[in-house]
Amino acid sequence: MLAGFIARVAVHIFYQVDRAGHPPPSGALILLPNHPNALLDPALIRATAGRDIRFVAKSTLFRGFFGPLVRAFGAIPVFRKQDAGVDVSRNAEMFAAVNAALAAGEAICIFPEGISHSTGKLEPLRTGAARMALSASAQGTAVRLVPVGINPDRKTTFRSRMTVVYGQAFAVDSKATVQALTSEVAERMRHLIVEADPEADAALVLRVEQLYAAERSAADSIEAAIARRRLIAAGLARLRQERPEWYEASLLQLRRYDRRLRRFGLRDSVLDWNTSSADALRFMARELPMAIVLVPVAAAAFAVFVVPYGLTALSARLHKDTDVTATAKVIGGSVFYALWILVLSVFAGKWLGLTAGLLTASFLPVLAAAGLFAIERESSAFGTARSWLALRGAHACTRKRLRRHRAELADVLDEVHLYIQTVNSQLPTSNSQERQKAQDT
């Protein structure tokens, strides 16, 4: 219970977490997420699954600093041959522990890629999850598998958005081969993941999806946004490979449009706003009282916690691997903020008395949470006001040209989608594997 609470607090502080899809049902389950974010991925699953989860984790994590945390999560060690000094014969113990947990109706989580990574793609799956499921099924346990997609917007950035999508649970066919079940898991996982090269396409996918959603007034549900991003990512990859001249021309058009937006201080979503004075007055009537209360809170929190915030950011720069950067920030931030609160509380207690020290220790965590809310709330309100003023100040012809340019770019996306559908329909039906690969895009 405590481990689950800590996980929820940690991930909801660092990320803006969205959860979508099918709630994991009760009974014996094996959850199968992708693994882009080191130790934060188990915390995300624990925070969003809606039920207690036990994890299968590499045995080396049970040693040293992370040992108590891993044990608190009720993790089951797996002994990997690539880890030095590990006796892989002990995996018999792992299978026995997994079978016992599933027989008791528990939920197990294993990351079937076997590694944490920053490729932006689903890596080839190991067969361990399939072997666990088939082993439990052979012993009479009605186990179901749940594919999960972890989709970060900017995974190393504090307060960026993280979307966790749970797929439909499906039963294990006890007659299936290990390889067939592994392939089915991979296919189901791909439908929940936005696969985009973080160096080439990831930011572009987000940008294009924002533009398209604004122009088409597209459904704003989490599932719809992820589906759009999957199509856009696949379309960009295919276009760059098969029609590079079209890809470059479209990218140039998008960059020109973005430069014009920046020149006028505008965003896609504001081009259709109503700029009437009545709307402005209603906005001010709502936001000014909030600002009177929240701006001092935000300023106080910033002044008090600027030191641990800076130390956390500095420590994260020491990590070159982006798949562990967010984990380093969370762990480093927890340590730096806790020590800072302790130092200030001891200082207050020494100079103002024990009661003042205890009150300081109780008040500062509340100030940190309230300050985070206030900073985000007022930053959003300020951004809205600035965008409204920029739109109001732009000439009507400018707004019209920008909307037309946005519409043209959305039309290009529709043309790309139609092109991919046409190419897919012309693939030879005999080559089923290649056809399935194309359909996944």
Language-model regions: role of each:
Residues 1-33, 38-44, 49-53, 67-68, ...:
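Membrane-anchoring hydrophobic helices of lipid-metabolizing enzymes
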Residues 87-273, 281, 363-424:
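Non-catalytic C-terminal accessory region of glycerolipid acyltransferases
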Residues 55-59:
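Short internal beta-strands
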Residues 285-310, 325-376:
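Alpha-helical bilayer-embedded segments of polytopic membrane proteins, i.e.
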Residues 35-38, 60-61, 151:
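Short beta->alpha connector loops
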Residues 422-441:
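Short, basic, low-complexity termini and linkers enriched in Ser/Thr/Gly/Pro
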